[in-house]
């Protein structure tokens, strides 16, 4: 059982009756409400709340075997609901080594033993399969142990990533937990000009709003521009909300989507378990955000002002107009039409229309892989696939391949590549000494023919369009709502569902400021210890934060509360970044925001976290102009009143109040995970 050291533990269960007053909800909150379990009667979920969820489906891919190993290590024998779990093999499908084939066989055998739906190598990329086969479906909440689960939002399904421990929990118990993120409303206005596509939209959004405006947010796309986007374009945009920093990218269910599903009915064998007359007919009963729903931010972009864009090189936050790059005569070595982002039928046909009656330029390698075997079959039937092959494109099996840096055709030292994929991080698609750009399928195909980054119009011999000035805006309501939350905190002392035995009603400690943004997991727990499994707890405590500040250990003590800047815990998935803080007898970290994987690893290991941007801003203002210190004892104390869902900051332990603010509710289901020492302990208790 988890012990809060140096804390008094409340043994009484505090319970609150929820008000019957309607709380306006956005679409994200409404979907989560459907899939949240164990809520107190009358509880309406809101952004910031920690909730237990029972997702409609959970997908794992090549990482299914590590999840299975963790699942077995928990003592689980049988999957709780084998209709909830889906397994696909898609990442390393070109790898025919004995080791990889053995792993694939183990996954298939496990799926067979458990009666789990399994899709072998060659069937397609897992996210595409999830959409095609209806595991991701409008108004569902579907998770996957992969960062591009956001893609499901393109069909009105709330898709979000989880880590392997979460997946093992879903297998064993049918559920895991989620903190409902702040929700950003992104309004798409107008209609895209000819020659501009969904990929250009998300490249523009990533490039224009590139200061973490939507980091760890849920996104809801709205506006009259949505109806002009095809479903394939919506899937592309939702897919790359991951690179934009968001945890979901949700489009509305509208007539365009309903007609798309009507067509899907004719393509799938009927009766189909998930996409059938009944489920499609039910989409006419629209679920919409309340008109007075709250959003953390409102962003707007006018689609009519966009032109073709590229991301890069080597960053999705750097964007340039095609007009500018085309004029620079940037030679390319490789081009890629692959991945779950842009390898659907419309993408392949668009590329084929550009490349028909032409050849891939000498010295250029053009790789193509369909997002699924279904897509490839349709592309072959339409003639688009053969058009690409006749032009000199090199086919790859349906799967992730070069997008994830696996298999044939990777970028080599000094090469330049242009790709219709979602990530161009340095070294991701091959050599760290290569340059990678992201673009739409049309621009990728044109560049493959031209041998340089260029327009389709250059292939056609038509005039090249110029760049436009993009019209966009952002309004941030965080500061206003923070003040409103503070006022509400004064008047609403008990919004929580209660406190379990063994969980403290209050957590208090002195704030120790680590004043930096983007403190990564290597700064928290040095990489040289990550794969040493025998590091004792005392040593973990000693090296905690040493890469960030070697003096951290001498300046901090048990019971302190770390307070830091934005995107705390970014970087790798190492769980020790959370457990080393616990080893120092610190049970709470407050930050402006957290890296998503760190947040999940924290709760999964019983470390509590709170996002309070207003506190960070107050502390930074307090020390403005003073000599910088990596680690600073502030003399301010924070008290988290768990049943009241408020944090009060005072100058001194019993001094004047500096800040009082509402925070997300930590429901009893989540408290139980903490009391059990983390998610694995909780799962074991359920078996």
Swiss-Prot record:
Q: Which UniProt keywords apply?
A: Amino-acid biosynthesis, Iron, Iron-sulfur, Lyase, Lysine biosynthesis, Metal-binding, Mitochondrion, Transit peptide
What gene does the UniProt entry assign to this protein?
LYS4
Q: Which NCBIfam families match?
A: h_aconitase (TIGR00139)
Catalyses which reaction(s) = (2R,3S)-homoisocitrate = cis-homoaconitate + H2O
Bias class Acidic residues marks the residues at: 481-490
- Give the GO terms filed under biological process for this record: lysine biosynthetic process via aminoadipic acid
Protein's name in the database: Homoaconitase, mitochondrial
The similarity comment for this entry is: Belongs to the aconitase/IPM isomerase family.
The record's listing under InterPro entries reads:
Acnase/IPM_dHydase_lsu_aba_1/3 (IPR015931), Acoase/IPM_deHydtase_lsu_aba (IPR001030), Aconitase/3IPM_dehydase_swvl (IPR015928), Aconitase_4Fe-4S_BS (IPR018136), Aconitase_4Fe-4S_dom (IPR036008), AconitaseA/IPMdHydase_ssu_swvl (IPR000573), Homoaconitase_mito (IPR004418), Homoaconitase_swivel (IPR039386)
FT transit peptide: 1-18
Q: Where in the cell is it found?
A: Mitochondrion
């Amino acid at each position: 059982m988890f012990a809060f050291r140096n804390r008094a533990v409340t043994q009484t269960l505090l319970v609150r009756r929820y008000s019957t007053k309607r709380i306006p909800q956005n679409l994200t909150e409404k979907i989560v409400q459907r899939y949240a379990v164990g809520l107190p009667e009358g509880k309406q979920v809101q952004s910031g709340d920690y909730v237990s969820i029972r997702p409609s489906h959970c997908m794992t891919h090549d990482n299914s075997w590590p999840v299975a190993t963790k699942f077995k290590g928990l003592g689980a024998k049988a999957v709780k609901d084998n209709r909830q779990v889906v397994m696909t093999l898609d990442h390393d499908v070109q790898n025919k080594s004995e080791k990889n084939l053995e792993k694939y066989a183990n996954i298939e055998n496990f799926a067979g033993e458990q009666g789990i739906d399994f899709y072998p190598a060659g069937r397609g990329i897992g996210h595409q399969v999830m959409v095609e086969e209806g595991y991701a479906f409008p108004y569902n909440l579907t998770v996957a142990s992969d960062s591009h689960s956001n893609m499901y939002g393109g069909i009105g399904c709330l898709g979000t990533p989880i880590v392997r421990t979460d997946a093992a929990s879903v297998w064993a118990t049918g559920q895991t937990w989620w903190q409902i993120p702040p929700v950003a409303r992104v309004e798409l206005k107008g209609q895209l000009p000819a020659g501009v596509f969904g990929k250009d939209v998300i490249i523009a959004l990533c490039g224009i709003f590139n200061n973490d405006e939507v980091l760890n947010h849920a996104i809801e796309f709205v506006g009259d521009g949505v109806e002009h986007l095809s479903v394939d374009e919506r899937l592309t945009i939702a897919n790359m909300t991951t690179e934009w920093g968001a945890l979901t990218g949700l489009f509305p269910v509208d007539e365009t989507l309903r007609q798309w599903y009507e067509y899907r009915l004719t393509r799938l064998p009927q009766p189909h378990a998930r996409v059938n007359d009944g489920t499609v007919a039910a989409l006419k009963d629209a679920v919409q955000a309340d008109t007075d729903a709250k959003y953390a931010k409102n962003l707007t972009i006018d689609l009519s002002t966009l032109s073709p864009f590229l991301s890069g090189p080597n960053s999705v936050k750097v964007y340039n107009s095609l007009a500018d790059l085309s004029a620079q005569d940037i030679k390319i070595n490789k081009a890629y039409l692959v991945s779950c982002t842009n390898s659907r039928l419309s993408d392949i046909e668009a590329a084929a229309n550009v490349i028909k009656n032409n050849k891939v330029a000498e010295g250029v390698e053009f790789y193509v892989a369909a997002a699924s075997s279904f897509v490839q079959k349709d592309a072959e039937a339409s003639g688009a696939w053969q058009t690409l092959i006749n032009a000199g494109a090199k086919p790859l099996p349906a799967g992730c391949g070069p997008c994830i840096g696996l298999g044939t055709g990777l970028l080599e030292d000094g090469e330049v590549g242009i790709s219709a994929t979602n990530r161009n991080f340095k070294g991701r698609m091959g050599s760290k000494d290569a340059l990678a750009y992201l673009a739409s399928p049309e621009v990728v195909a044109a560049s493959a023919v031209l041998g340089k980054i260029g327009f389709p119009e250059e292939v056609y011999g038509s005039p090249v369009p110029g760049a436009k000035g993009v019209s966009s805006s952002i309004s941030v309501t965080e500061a206003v709502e923070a003040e409103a939350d503070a006022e509400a905190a004064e008047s609403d002392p008990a919004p929580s569902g209660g406190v379990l035995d063994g969980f403290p009603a209050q957590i208090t400690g002195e704030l120790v400021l680590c004043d930096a943004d983007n403190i990564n997991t290597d700064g928290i727990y040095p990489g040289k210890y990550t794969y040493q499994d025998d590091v004792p707890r005392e040593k973990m405590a000693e090296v905690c934060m040493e890469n960030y500040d070697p003096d951290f250990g001498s300046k901090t003590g048990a019971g302190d509360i770390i307070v830091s800047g934005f995107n705390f815990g970014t970087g790798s998935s190492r769980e020790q970044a959370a457990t080393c803080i616990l080893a120092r007898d610190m049970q709470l970290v407050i930050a402006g925001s957290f890296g998503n994987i760190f947040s999940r690893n924290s709760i999964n290991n019983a470390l509590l976290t709170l996002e309070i941007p207003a506190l960070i801003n107050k502390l930074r203002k307090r020390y403005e102009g003073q000599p910088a210190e990596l680690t600073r004892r502030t003399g301010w104390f924070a008290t988290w009143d768990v049943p009241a869902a408020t944090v009060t900051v005072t100058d001194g332990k019993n001094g004047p109040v500096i800040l009082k603010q509402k925070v997300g509710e930590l429901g009893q289901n989540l408290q139980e995970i903490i009391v059990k020492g983390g998610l694995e302990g909780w799962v074991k208790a359920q078996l």
